[in-house]
Amino acid sequence: KLIFDEFIIRPSEIEEDIPSAINYELAAEYLASKKANSVVKKSNELVIGCDTVVTAGNIILGKPHDCKECRKMLRLLSGRTHSVYTGVSIIFNGKEFCFTEKTDVKFRNISDEEIEEYMNTGEPFDKAGGYGIQGRGALFVQSICGDYFNVVGLPVSRLNYELKKIVL
């Protein structure tokens, strides 16, 4: 709603597997492109696909499948800086334009008790890296360098800038 007053959400049914040959910095863009291309119906429509991945070092952290995986992710992020990459694919008039936005997030040290309490909310299981900065996951954040909305999952300022170049 920040960019468009009206839009239609078409969920993608793609498998979110990332080929091992893809650089972790481009993984989100790869998935965003797959999503956008899977839902485009007409050549003259505007389609925006996006995907977010979290990396700790060279390790890509997707959405945790269970408590064990979530616990491992949050322990890995505890007390460290990690990177959040959101890839965006814009399809317009049969052409595709892609970009990736990066934001660095530093977590404070998180206790095992805090991790268990957070997992019990159910919040972390549908989010890359096992946390949502827009929810209770914000309680773990010590600092952020970059676009907050990128960590939420859509870098709206950059998207607006890129759309103006493409559509106008």
Regions found by a protein language model. Give the residues of each.
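Short loop/helix-cap segments at secondary-structure boundaries that form the rim of catalytic
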Residues: 1-2, 19, 41-42
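Anionic-ligand binding patches
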Residues: 22-168
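N-terminal G-site helix/loop of the GST-like fold
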Residues: 1-10, 166-168
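Short glycine-rich, Thr/Ser-proximal phosphate-binding strand/loop in the N-terminal lobe
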Residues: 5-19, 96-102
